[in-house]
Amino acid sequence: MDHALLELARRRPVVFDGAMGTEIQGRSLTAADFGGREGLNEILSVTRPDVIRDIHRAYLRAGADVIETNSFGANAIVLREYGQEGRARELSLASALLARQVADECSSPEWPRYVSGSVGPGTRLPSLGQIGFPGMLACYREQVAGLLEGGVDLVQVETCQDPLQARIAVLAAREAMAAAGREVPLFVQVTFDRNGTMLLGTDPLAAVVSLAGLPGVSAFGINCATGPEDMHHVLAELARACPLPLVVLPNAGLPENVGGVLTYRLTPADFARHVAGFVTELGVAFAGGCCGTTPAHIAALVDALRGATVGARSPVLPAAASSLFSAVPFAQAARPLILGERTNDNGSKAFRERLAAGDLEGMVGIARDQQAEGAHLLDGCLAMVGRDEA
């Protein structure tokens, strides 16, 4: 899609802001500031908008091109834990209006500033059956609707730990855009641990295959979980495969408990050096910070990127199928690609009988047998007359 922010990224690196949550924690707010719901950062957009405005302004003064709304958990999934599930659209709208106001105040024709609508992962993982598809879809759709109404320039689905959760959020965002009659760029960011997998075990190629090609996604990347020094190997893999512009927002290192206080030790200078290297060496187009980063970290990054250009990339995304854990390219070194078809109840009497009996272990056993026999992919079909596939 054509959008001024995407066009800007084709000319120079685009800098996002840093952390919201840890900045709020450093403000010594009381329970009264949260309306008696301490820990619900999103409610501050209503109860203490001055605090949120100050944080936004600090990042813009540091040189950020993009600020994120205070809406990371502004969906009914999270708000239900505070008894506020009916306020998702209200809080999303309020956060977007605050960020929009501050961004417009700091914008000029020569240097426009942008607002990103932050959509966090929530607290339920659909791949583990903790929440159903329709319920999660409705929650995200409501959140994004509020952000769009408040005037965000893009929607940022971030800190994703479950590919299915990310896919649901993308679908919800597109539905909300269609309902609003307004399409904006859609960024997707996943989270990898130091071992290079997402929380449920998804590897980088599987994440790219399952998410980067979704309709409407404009940029793909990673944020949170680790500092930049632990992201390099994953980001390098994404740079080789992802056909979309890359975005990276690391933490200020790994958190440490110092005297009972969660502390991030990576200095602004070291943070900027690492992240600027991602831009020039790995071709990252959008860079900023996550937990523990401050306006000082973003100011250092802006200085480090002054005059820099985004490194060239020639990504090659293989045609592949992805599971929750890994991706299998269709072009195998030792051909042919072998497709196991005995996990299809239309073609396997043994599988159909186990399906009818609800024998999950038996069905998995058939799948494992085919894998042991050399199958690269499995043809899974659970459609049976009279059976609820859900």
Which residues fall in each region the model found?
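Domain-level signal for soluble alpha/beta catalytic cores
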Residues: 1-390
